[in-house]
Amino acid sequence: MIKKYLYLLLALPLVALSFQSCIKDDSYGPSGNSSKLSLAQDLQEKYTLNRWDTLKISPNVVQTNEQKKVDYEWEVNGKVVSTDASLKYVCKDFGSFPCRLKVSNGDNIQYYEFGLNVQYSYVDGLYILASNSGKTIVSYLPEEGSTKTFDLDVLQKNNPSIDFTGEPKGIDYALARDNKTPLLFVAVGNPSTIYEFDGNLMNMRFTTNSTGDVTYLRKSALTYPKSMLTMVNHVPNRLTLSETSLFNLGRSIKDGLGSDISLADAATAWKQQDLRYVQGYVMFDNAEGRLVAQKVQATGKVPVELLKGKFTGETLVGMGPVDNERNIVLLTWNATSSKFKCYYIFPGFYPSTATKVEAAVVKDEAVVPATAGLTTQSVVRVSAEKNLVYYSAGNKLYAYNVLSGGNFPQSALTTFGDAGETIADMLILEGSNKLYVATNAASGQLVGSIYCFDMNENKLLWAKKNITGRIKNITYRQ
């Protein structure tokens, strides 16, 4: 019995050796058909793309022996997203995700891990509000040299369940109350709906329904509460960020003036002389020709009307800040006298001490000659740093120095595009020498174009022709 067990123990190592030899022969011997898998070139450790870009990977799989059918399985964040040999994955979600490729051929299985970093798509660049096929769209145009890509419409892509049918009414960019989260506001239709979007993902956060037609939507000069200023049927309203109801500012203005108002689609803030605080902002009442003021950080009382009686019978063409926002400039039209006028104004200083109050003063005024090119349809933008007033006529751009004492231009500074194009909006980028100009062609499928003009060198930096629908407004996110 003991001998029997000894023979058995001695036989076990021989059986094991024989078993190992069979695996080795079958895998690597000349007559074996098992084929090991590998990649001819390693995958990247991490792939970085913008949201909505497509991750494309085409691995070259090598087999050691028989060329068998290879199965593929691509995983992103633990989910199988493709079983094709080449990966084409649309990066819909923002963030960093673990990824894995599994390849198998029946004999061998290999795993290859890599990372995917999806960045925000919409950062520095222009946001272009336009109409296209009966709907409001917002096109994103990144800065020159950016790795980001142009997108014709960021609204529908990121909010597929929302119907943006209707005319575009207004757009602007602001930081949320945390001073970090970027927000984009867009007004659509009549009666108008104001949408608040997350500026990074372009997902809708809040909607506000107005009772009338929004014709103006811009970031308010108010520091508290942080808000948007909007004109609803030419009456000013305040929309506090991330809230859904409009506060009518027109009631108190109407009570202060003693009559109805019809405000122009413009507002301009001014600062005290040391530039530390924003004293207030002004609007213009086209109903009777009045410069309407609202308090921001002034410690004293700001009159509801500045320079009473000075602008009777006039309507606003455009306004803006000069002297680094210490003063303002107005361009007006008087239909009775058929005259355009330019006013250079100090809006006043309103501290709590009555003896230190400085009333508003017209520092200079001049009749704008017919040869200067100004029209009632001119788009007007003002450089607070350069004291230059830029205004349009068709596709022509004019420039007037407020400090020149009435020395208006006799010819256009430059023109944009073809003769049939019309300047729809302009934007001066704060702290830079860039003037962005948006034009619309008379006809075509995509009529909207964008031009970038150097205000220092007075030359065109670049042009993007016919890239979007009919443009209403533009804004910039920095």
Model-derived features: where do they sit?
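Acidic, serine/threonine- and glycine-rich low-complexity intrinsically disordered segments
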Residues: 201-395
